[in-house]
């Protein structure tokens, strides 16, 4: 029905604002027409000259059509309350030399003494479970408890982006599902890529933009595919609310640091012509051993450097000074000393490891990979030479990030057992046609996450092919051949922390790996545009404020009986709650919410038998605290998860494949031949026990399947791709 019948009646219509009398436009007079026959006069009723009070306006009736779409609505639960989670979150904590790392993957780690911590950017997925873990760390507060109501609905997020004292940063959020990360996700978190993206917020530091408000506000709606309906907390706790990417940046000096003369840097790489076999295995497929390769590399021209002068007392002939003439003329005697010291170093290392009880059954030590006289010893790879014209076993190149167009660059990882450095075979995590500083940004972290191998840093290496260096790090004859880059500390015989002490297990396994390549990758990443390369202090941390909005609902029990207030007990301190002062509101793990009692569980003022049985079946014992935790829920999982991994835990037991158990083998005893029936009975008993376990597993799986079917029919099912 139209709105004008209920409009308030006034004698004169009120005019708003300044107004003036409208001048009538000039009337257009048409030319005279031919006279026509006069119509017959008809008597008509005179029109009312005074407006009638009340309803007088007519409106046209619209034609009715059938609705093509229906709006489905859901009834609200009996109890519907607002839940707000407010807190402060450290999104970036960065130590010196951690520009390439993702803080989200290193937040749950404990660094060694003297090592840096954190990273310059983070990719964090916020869920109800992460909010609960932050609550345990006293980083947020909940406006009310979630223990008595099991239904929840998400309404949105408000952020406060606090400005840092001297560090700028960029914020980008994603609401697309599934909230997962891939091999190129860390490249998109680079500050240059984030500035060029469509949806980003740049937060300048107080040094970059003096004055103004100390924080910026950002309002983020719920995810795109999330429906506005009620979910159970147990299933909703793993749903991604927002995927937040935050990267520190330098807006004042984006292209070059103010305290250097050039943005270019020096990159050292292994010369594939001299190192024909880079495998760490004792020999290659052709049968040639590492002894032939080490004899080829150890020459007077390759080893005449400051490192040889430093250890001259261990390799010199008797009564000989360190001069070029003595070094070249008496090289045969020096070479013999080096070979003797190589064997004695291995013997002393084995004895020391045996005394300290560090030797294992598979502890293999190759003398060709020793620290002092091996294939990659500082005697061969020392970066400084007395004469630059000397032949070197490594290649030295200059790299300018401002000239890197990315076309032709290739970065990949490969195992240490591979003979050659090429991406034609056994190459993993290959990134092509991207600038070197962009491809290596967070590259090691995402590769370690995809590999899921604890020994990833010590069993793999990073290879690079780049035509934008001088000389070019590529091969003219083989298009798939690359180079293994080296850090200066590794070439000097030092560990990445620049400590002169090298662990015993590493002295017999001195070869380039990702553990030793982190420094050169850090240097390449720090040369890129907009990265924080000119820090004033050794560390920085960025904090944001968040306010998550939820609606929590369910059915509460009937209120308790009212007692006499004069007879209530007292306590020494009149503190409200009288319990944990740090957490006035009791918050439970959302994964375990949903087994509380409801009003329909009461029968004549007592709990029913079925409700007590449900509580006993679903109650879980308190799990012990695991430190350090294996996985952090705030770190987004990599792409490529199967359907079994996305489903609930109960349904996963039904979908997972059954592993074939190994055949039963009983240890030999003297009575085995005399009592074959006992062995047969034991085998049958174990087979029966295994069948019972499979039946219980199938029972849990079918139970979860039925629960999922009921939820889907009641429109309470949760999209597994939201998790």
Swiss-Prot record:
Pfam families (alphabetical): TT_ORF1
Similarity-based family: Belongs to the anelloviridae capsid protein family.
InterPro entries the UniProt entry points to: TTvirus_Unk
Physiological role: Self assemble to form an icosahedral capsid.
Highest taxon in the source lineage: Viruses
Keywords: Capsid protein, T=1 icosahedral capsid protein, Virion
Annotated region described as Disordered, given as residue ranges: 658-679
GO CC, one annotated term: T=1 icosahedral viral capsid
Organism of origin: Torque teno virus (isolate Japanese macaque/Japan/Mf-TTV9/2000) (TTV)
Name used for this protein in its record: Capsid protein
Subcellular locations according to the entry: Virion
Keyword Lipid biosynthesis listed: no
Keyword Lipoprotein set for record: no
